[in-house]
Regions:
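Extreme N-terminal starter segment of soluble prokaryotic enzymes
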Residues: 2-8
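Short beta-strand segments
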Residues: 38-40, 165-168, 203-208
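Donor-binding and catalytic core of enzymes assembling or modifying cell-surface/extracellular glycoconjugates
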Residues: 15, 194-270, 275-278, 284
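Short amphipathic alpha-helix
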Residues: 21-28
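Secretory-pathway luminal glycosyltransferase catalytic domains
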Residues: 5, 49-199
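Leloir-type glycosyltransferase catalytic cores
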Residues: 64, 277-292
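A short beta-strand-loop structural module common to alpha/beta enzyme folds
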Residues: 34-45
Length: 292
């Protein structure tokens, strides 16, 4: 007889992915009126980016956290095997108590049993919007718990004149076998053109994990400034980006969340295509964003 009174979610990947996963888990826990347990063992094992942790945000309030690393490679292997088995067999998914969807987007979680662990991407704004509509969470919930002095200094500097935030992903995006589409110089030129004269005189600040790549990609765009992201955390970088007057997103969940919590619409530009073989669902982009 099952006595669980919780659902759980496994976090992995960069900060944008972690936020999507947490929102899916929180939405399910609220629906079921049960506790939310968060499994960050994969983050402890290094399945994330440097300085990328969701726990810096005020909204991150799980009822229980499981933060231990896997005991050894064999333990990690069997854990991976359980995920794959659950993804391919509904029977094993119920037996193991794992929800491992084949798609990266929205999943109807209403039929899941209490005690199930979510192991997927859940890249849909629906979970966040549902929580926001019910008052459980809001854009203000993304307040940083302990902002650093470096963050405060940058925030003050940027606030003086206003700014456009331009996000460029490099690093793993240039070599990842998952098939990310590479953003082109034309995309960024078109995006800035779409924003129009209203923002043309604002300083342009580039947020990137690969400055050399970004400088080469944006060489034809004059008067760029580059945020020194190594001195602040991923959460702090996301908040700085969200406070911009206009945002040019990359095909990244990181700048997606910065734009989503900014409260802006027409001053957000994002690429329509993210992956080579899959498309974003129609409801992925909020109404009013400029999608090109």
């Amino acid at each position: 007889m099952k006595t669980h009174n919780f659902v759980s979610v496994r976090l992995f990947g960069g900060l944008g992915n972690q936020i999507f996963q947490y929102m899916a888990g929180k939405s399910l826990a609220v629906d079921r009126e049960c506790d939310l347990h968060v499994d960050s063992s994969w983050l402890q094992d290094g399945y994330t980016h440097e300085k990328s942790t969701i726990s810096e945000f005020r909204f991150f309030q799980p009822d229980h956290k499981y933060e231990r690393k896997h005991r050894n490679l064999l333990h990690l292997y069997f854990d991976r095997l359980a995920t794959v088995a659950s993804r391919n067999s509904a029977f094993l998914a119920r037996l193991l108590g794992i929800h491992a969807p084949k798609s990266a987007g929205f999943e109807d979680l209403s039929e899941l049993e209490i005690g199930t662990q979510l192991r997927g991407y859940y890249q849909s704004p629906r979970y966040f919007m549902k929580l926001a509509d019910s008052g459980v969470i809001s854009e203000a919930s993304f307040e940083l718990l302990e902002p650093s002095q470096e963050f405060d200094s940058l925030a003050t500097q940027l606030r003086r004149s206003g700014y456009i935030a331009i996000h460029v992903r490099g690093g793993d995006y240039l070599h990842n076998k998952a098939g990310y589409i590479q953003m082109t110089t034309k995309y960024y030129l078109d995006a800035l053109s779409l924003l129009g004269s209203k923002y043309s005189d604002l300083p342009k600040w580039v947020f990137t994990d690969d400055e050399n790549h970004a400088r080469n990609l944006l060489a034809s765009i004059p008067n760029l400034n580059f945020i020194e992201v190594k001195i602040i955390t991923a959460a702090e970088t996301l908040i700085l980006m969200s406070r911009a007057d206009a945002i040019v997103c990359a095909n990244s969940t990181f700048s997606y969340w910065a734009a989503l919590i900014s409260g802006k619409t027409s001053s957000i530009v994002a690429p329509r295509s993210w992956m080579e073989k899959t498309n974003r669902p129609e409801d992925f982009f909020p109404i009013g964003w400029q999608i090109i």
